[in-house]
Amino acid sequence: MTEYKLVVVGAGGVGKSALTIQLIQNHFVDEYDPTIEDSYRKQVVIDGETCLLDILDTAGQEEYSAMRDQYMRTGEGFLLVFAVNSAKSFEDIGTYREQIKRVKDAEEVPMVLVGNKCDLASWNVQNEQAREVAKQYGIPYIETSAKTRMGVDDAFYTLVREIRKDKDNKGRKGRKTNKPNRRFKCKML
């Protein structure tokens, strides 16, 4: 069974833990208890393949930013979560994305942009803004509500599909060359 290491990142209070717990335990946690770092595992079937999701729910607070590099190194894919009622959390997404790319030393890393709290009446980040940013980044955009469970499975499952696509692309690049494999022998002088 394939295991996928997913990391949920975003500013404090955007609903990272609520999304993760909704996926894992099917219930909404409405009290806010800032996370330092929590890990969850769940077996699911995505596109006919049984797989194990290893989800790291991270701290959004700035005082825990020193821990970020470590979890970014180990993650295979990232949910970039912002709250639709917080323009600041949306602005922070670019910083998270750049940090992930720097730590992973890669231009393309599997990511999904997630606009959470879509059940709220007032939005400070419009759908079009988020779609435009996702398009610029070349990543999918999913709207979610941890409260109503809208889009929760879709967000995590889309990230798994992005990881699979990334692995397929890297596999093809590695096999593409038509040049014969030449080995050079070292000579000690």
Curated annotation (Swiss-Prot):
Catalytic activity line of the entry: GTP + H2O = GDP + phosphate + H(+)
Localization (cell): Cell membrane
Gene3D superfamilies xref list: P-loop containing nucleotide triphosphate hydrolases (3.40.50.300)
Ways its activity is controlled: Alternates between an inactive form bound to GDP and an active form bound to GTP. Activated by a guanine nucleotide-exchange factor (GEF) and inactivated by a GTPase-activating protein (GAP).
Residues with lipid group (S-geranylgeranyl cysteine): 186
Annotated GO CC locations: membrane; plasma membrane
Pfam families: Ras
Keyword Ribonucleoprotein: no
GO molecular function per UniProt: G protein activity; GTP binding; protein serine/threonine kinase activator activity
Motif (Effector region): 32-40
Coiled coil: none
EC class name: hydrolase
Keywords: Cell membrane, GTP-binding, Hydrolase, Lipoprotein, Membrane, Methylation, Nucleotide-binding, Prenylation
Gene Ontology biological-process annotations: border follicle cell migration; cellular response to starvation; chorion-containing eggshell pattern formation; defense response to virus; determination of adult lifespan; dorsal closure, spreading of leading edge cells; epidermal growth factor receptor signaling pathway; epithelial cell migration, open tracheal system
Protein topology in the membrane: Lipid-anchor
Residue numbers covered by the propeptide annotation in the UniProt entry: 187-189
Record: residues binding GTP: 10-17, 57-61, 116-119
Modified residues (Cysteine methyl ester): 186
Keyword Cell membrane on entry: yes
InterPro entries in the cross-refs: P-loop_NTPase, Small_GTP-bd, Small_GTPase, Small_GTPase_Ras-type
Family recorded in the similarity comment: Belongs to the small GTPase superfamily. Ras family.
Functional note: Ras proteins bind GDP/GTP and possess intrinsic GTPase activity. Plays a role in eye development by regulating cell growth, survival of postmitotic ommatidial cells and differentiation of photoreceptor cells. During larval development, mediates Ptth/tor signaling leading to the production of ecdysone, a hormone required for the initiation of metamorphosis.
Protein name: Ras-like protein 1
Designated gene of the protein: Ras85D
